Amino acid sequence: MAGVTQPKPAGASEPPFARAASQASIELYWLPLGAGGWLVRLNGRIYEAIHAFLERRRPLDLYHSALIVQVPEGRFVIEDAWPIPDADGPSSRGVAVEGPVGSRRMARWRVFRYEVRRWRDGVIADASEAVASPQLLSDDPLVARRLLDVVGSLPSPVWGRDELKTGEMWNSNSVIAWVLAQSGLSTDAIGPPAGGRAPGWQAGLITARHQQLSDEQAGHGAGDATSRVGRPGVAATA
């Protein structure tokens, strides 16, 4: 397993997916929150301005994270997305898990659900705007396969709320942090670009650690996802 490599500078001209099909890798992408969408970007700035004021610090850039995982069998995009564009996620976008947004009561409608993709040959929207990316986290094929395996075992707490009592709301960064931790990778040196932060990241790490401790106490292996926090998937009726 390789350590975290020095990231490429922002705007690097090398195509982000230019890798040999037989090479194994786990690459992390940091995308500015709201890249390609002014409303999300505006809401993010307001959110960060409020938090910066309350914490008596300067506002930081906010980031959304995603992964590209290469194994000999193919290349996969791991990303949390909301809103869900249509009902064809499992077949067209490799959706592995869905969860509620804002409230479980509203999750019967697709607009109030998020989806976690394990998308073969998928794309990351606005990948060209990623900052200090990609970061190579591992080139170990066993770790890469393990990461792909654990995606389907993700908990599905309410997006945008601290349902798991971690001190942070659950969001897309929580998903990426959780799968990295559950894959066995060290997350100590992983973080957003300088001058930025990734809300929800610690929620994913804390949840993964709680599950690992629960599994150990129950006599399961570290990689066994028998113990769950939250409920994987929600019924889709819209």
Where are these regions (language model features)?
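Active-site nucleophilic cysteine motif
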Residues: 62, 160-183
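Short, surface-exposed recognition loops or helix-turn segments adjacent to catalytic cores
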Residues: 161-169, 189-198
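Intrinsic disorder/low-complexity segments enriched in polar/small residues
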Residues: 7-9, 217-218, 226
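Non-catalytic ligand/cofactor/substrate-binding and regulatory segments of enzyme domains
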Residues: 2-166, 210-213
